[in-house]
């Protein structure tokens, strides 16, 4: 049970804006060791042409954004809950 706000950010399936250099995964590096109490909000970037898998970004209470390792059981559970809840 999380007490921080979460956001799902679906990206357009065909992003033909001429800025192909931006079509890449946001999370090139992830972390797995963060205490959930230090997180103020979560953002999910859905999979698409820019990246083959969804990405989970956490904003720490300090304002710093970090990417969470979606293979960790806790983060997998959070990601699944967010994706399932927002696709209705």
UniProtKB/Swiss-Prot annotation:
InterPro entries: Chemokine_b/g/d, Chemokine_CXC, Chemokine_CXC_CS, Chemokine_IL8-like_dom, CXC_Chemokine_domain, Interleukin_8-like_sf. This is Platelet factor 4. Keywords: Chemotaxis, Cytokine, Disulfide bond, Glycoprotein, Heparin-binding, Phosphoprotein, Proteoglycan, Secreted. GO terms for cellular component: extracellular space. O-linked glycan consists of Gal-GalNAc disaccharide which is modified with sialic acid residues (microheterogeneity). The keyword Hydrolase does not apply. Disulfide bonds join 25-51, 27-67. The modification Phosphoserine is found at residue 41. Chemokine released during platelet aggregation that plays a role in different biological processes including hematopoiesis, cell proliferation, differentiation, and activation. Acts via different functional receptors including CCR1, CXCR3A or CXCR3B. Upon interaction with CXCR3A receptor, induces activated T-lymphocytes migration mediated via downstream Ras/extracellular signal-regulated kinase (ERK) signaling. Neutralizes the anticoagulant effect of heparin by binding more strongly to heparin than to the chondroitin-4-sulfate chains of the carrier molecule. Its main location: secreted. It is found in: Secreted. It comes from the Eukaryota. Belongs to the intercrine alpha (chemokine CxC) family.
